[in-house]
């Protein structure tokens, strides 16, 4: 990439190695999930920029929600709400933030604790393999781990997301320039 250019790093066997410095910002993607009681005419309610009331998982319009429910084997009715500080397709990782948040909420709903490594890998699989999005995996890694990270990829696709520690004065100087 050229000066000022940002590109997604390919994951898996396509990766020739590389590194990037990635930081999260103070904008959020709130995702909540609960089991929907069986008293409604619909089986699931998905609330995002629209409200979906569906009887079957296959009727869910939101592709990431439908794929995540299938990926995690969730058949029972659910209610999912998404509120984001940033619009979809903003170009700064909002879709990956949603994928990570959605998977985290669904695992919690199932009573499962899932760490950032697994969340990042599942979000990457969701976006790349199930939704066929032309993305790398640095956004998923950054969203799952948070903070300021040095992400490195080895040939073959293995990766690390190491925290970068800065002193208070450096943090202030960086924040003033962002």
Q: Would you name each region that the model predicts?
A:
Residues 16-21, 40-44, 76-78, 93, ...:
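Generic structural motif recognizing short loop/turn segments at the entrances and edges of beta-strands
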Residues 1-19, 54, 108-178:
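ATP-dependent small-molecule kinase catalytic core of the GHMP/sugar-kinase superfamily
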